[in-house]
């Protein structure tokens, strides 16, 4: 019988195993909302405790080791010590969410609602500056607040958009070493998210961890810049890639092959129906920087490189392969053109599909348990053939998903 780590490594090598490997909770794009995590713990009869939030922005809950055992999860995640709001994730306190759930969040985060029912979030927890994000009344996650200053084209400086991307410190290296050693000891495949390596991810563009963000911080302006200000973005990506490679060199020296997979970038290139940029813009603006980063990883480490991109991305998949990505996620099977069979036939020898196991827009929240079982078994039959598949949902499991539907999904996996 394969170990969890062996199972994932075999999938990444496009080899079969004793069963399809499973990930829930190893990254910020393969997680589970804290409401569902609490419901799963209750279902499995695990001890009650406030769910620890591992991604504050999306309110994802920790899939602790006892829950991972119950769910049959083969992966474990390792992240940094600060969240997207520059809050200290090593220093937590108990708070009650607007929907009445007790959770553990960074001490700088106060979940108290204002008179309209909104919860405001501040960069570094500093209320001397305007809020950088908000959880609107009735919402189960947090949204960015754009603080774009007037843009003077003559004074645009790429360094302003690099303020949050820095060389890794000795303290951070020590923290990663401790976390990776603990994660590796579980026998699960270690998936690391070191941060600072996502090129042009609009989740980071607003600078929610900065008190006074400068540069281009409007998502609309950023997308327009992919056409209007390409040299500006090139310079950002060049310098960011320099920083990333220097950090990876230090991380490899400390962590080595105890890490199996690195999530380098979560930039979305697809919408439900199309792409956010043309193939030509992708090849000109992103591909050379991705390739330089990934080439370094492949030449100097044993790590496999994980790329997240939502949406209808078939036209750019060849570019992602050329750029050296090993893994694609979330495999949005209900987006235009993203047929599972076609993806496996055309791209399955080059990419490992990490996701696509169950549709999270319609099937998982609204299907019956029996419909979900059939759907999951069908996806596993298609994507799991000859390896190259790690089961996960299409992006994170959201707050409104009935726990019995998640159990139906997991029970179906046990029969594959």
Region locations from a protein language model:
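Active-site loop segments of alpha/beta catalytic cores
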Residues: 1-41, 46, 50-53, 139-416
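Segments that shape or occlude catalytic/ligand-binding pockets
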Residues: 36-37, 41-86
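Acidic/aromatic-lined carbohydrate-recognition and catalytic surfaces
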Residues: 66-117
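Short, conserved acidic/polar surface loops in the N-terminal third of protein domains
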Residues: 80, 87-90, 123-124, 201-205
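A gly/proline- and charged-residue-enriched helix-loop-helix capping module
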Residues: 96-175
């Amino acid at each position: 019988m394969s170990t969890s780590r062996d199972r994932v490594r075999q999938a990444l090598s496009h080899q079969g195993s004793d069963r399809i490997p499973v990930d829930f909770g190893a990254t910020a794009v393969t997680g589970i909302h804290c409401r569902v995590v609490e419901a799963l713990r209750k279902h499995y009869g695990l001890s009650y405790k406030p769910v620890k939030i591992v991604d504050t922005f999306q309110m994802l809950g920790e899939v602790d080791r006892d829950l991972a055992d119950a769910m049959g999860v083969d992966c474990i995640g390792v992240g940094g010590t600060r969240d997207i709001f520059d809050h200290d994730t090593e220093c937590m306190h108990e708070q009650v969410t607007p929907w009445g759930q007790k959770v553990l969040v960074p001490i700088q985060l106060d979940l108290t609602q204002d008179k309209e029912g909104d919860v405001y979030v501040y960069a570094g927890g500093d209320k001397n500056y305007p809020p950088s994000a908000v959880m609107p009344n009735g919402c189960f996650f947090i949204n960015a607040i754009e603080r774009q200053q007037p843009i003077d084209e003559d004074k645009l400086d790429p360094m302003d958009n690099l303020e949050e991307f820095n060389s890794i410190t000795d303290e951070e290296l020590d923290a990663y070493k401790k976390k990776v050693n603990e994660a590796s000891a579980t026998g699960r495949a270690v998936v690391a998210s070191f941060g600072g390596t996502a090129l042009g991810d609009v989740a980071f563009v607003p600078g929610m961890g900065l008190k006074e963000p400068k540069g281009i911080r409007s998502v609309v302006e950023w997308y327009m810049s992919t056409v209007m200000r390409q040299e500006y973005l090139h310079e950002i990506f060049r310098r960011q890639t320099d920083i990333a490679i220097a950090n990876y060199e230090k991380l490899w020296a400390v962590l080595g092959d105890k890490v199996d997979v690195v999530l380098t970038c979560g930039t979305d290139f697809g919408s439900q129906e199309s792409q956010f940029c043309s193939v030509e813009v992708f090849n000109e603006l992103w591909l050379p920087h991705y390739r330089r980063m990934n080439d370094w990883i492949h030449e100097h480490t044993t790590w496999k490189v994980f790329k997240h991109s939502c949406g209808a991305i078939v036209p750019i998949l060849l570019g992602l392969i050329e750029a050296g990505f090993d893994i694609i996620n979330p495999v949005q099977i209900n987006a235009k053109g993203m047929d599972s069979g076609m993806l496996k036939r055309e791209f399955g020898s080059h990419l490992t599909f990490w996701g696509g196991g169950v549709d999270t827009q319609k099937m998982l929240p609204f299907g019956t348990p029996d419909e979900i079982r059939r759907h999951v078994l069908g996806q596993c039959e298609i994507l799991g053939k000859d390896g190259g598949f790690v089961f996960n949902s299409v992006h994170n499991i959201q707050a409104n998903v009935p726990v019995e539907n998640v159990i139906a999904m997991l029970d179906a996996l046990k029969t594959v």
